[in-house]
């Protein structure tokens, strides 16, 4: 609406919602015959945010079944069927507990955090990331190697919850239903068998600091980081319903397990397979809590990770499948890159097998496959944007083994396969 302000010939504009004039507010936004001020816009945003928070708990209460969760994991992670089953059941029960826990006051359902143990590059982190996508909940990854006790140089454990808050756009209620993945958890083990020798601020001290956070407590989280802004107001976050997944390679744990199994198998006719005869993943399947204690985790910490999932080594056939089958498979990624240059990228079966064999020799699991592909395709990716008429790039076994350059097929004479530059 428009009014004249006294003797002033110019008209003064007013907000159609609160009635304030354009001189009383910072901004007045015009619409067809109406106006709204910046204060009313902010108020509307607050109302919408409050309704969204309330809607978090008003869904139909349905949770994907373990089989549905496992099927989704299969689309992104190859192999590891046992670990997928363990994770699917644990996560299904966790979110079922959140949706139905308050309906029966007689029985209180406890939280089951998860410990993932497996060799490097076998899919621990990818499993956790895929789970977070499946449930559309806030997800954050933390690196245990950067954590220290409060008061020492390094990150406090509360920073993990701060990252989760940032992932949920500082929506506290949404963050309280999120998933936290703590990687490299094996790097915070006790540095000495004698706990009283010296203060272990990045090992046992971090385990103790994580205890209450993982079990469930109200954490005071500084929105801007606690050490640089000590005067700020703290946000209160209840960690009771946050699912913690810890993962680590636990190098050397297989030897501890093998020693324990060897001690049990004593007597006439007892056959014990030498550690060299069994792969690391096979030995880790036999892991017991006592092995984790001997490795350096404190009993209280092991007790707060009741669900144990061990992952297997990836063999050559699994690595070949990883290269081609998942939705975001490496071969599909590089084929997309070459499509952007109007060229088709093809790998022969022998080439994929040779690449997988190289990955096993490097002992870096699936993580090392990208660097192998980069090495094979680097020169081609460097030269291709400057070349004209290349319609196809073919990688065969000799190319994968470094014996020759990828084969380039030119559009004007597709019958002639030209190795190297034209």
Swiss-Prot record:
Keywords: ATP-binding, Chaperone, Metal-binding, Nucleotide-binding, Zinc. One of its GO terms (cellular component) is HslUV protease complex. ATP binds at residues 119-126. One of its GO terms (molecular function) is ATP binding. It holds the Pfam family zf-C4_ClpX. Residues 3-56 form the ClpX-type ZB domain. One of its GO terms (biological process) is cell division. ATP-dependent specificity component of the Clp protease. It directs the protease to specific substrates. Can perform chaperone functions in the absence of ClpP. Component of the ClpX-ClpP complex. Forms a hexameric ring that, in the presence of ATP, binds to fourteen ClpP subunits assembled into a disk-like structure with a central cavity, resembling the structure of eukaryotic proteasomes. This is ATP-dependent Clp protease ATP-binding subunit ClpX. It comes from Zymomonas mobilis subsp. mobilis (strain ATCC 31821 / ZM4 / CP4). The gene is clpX.
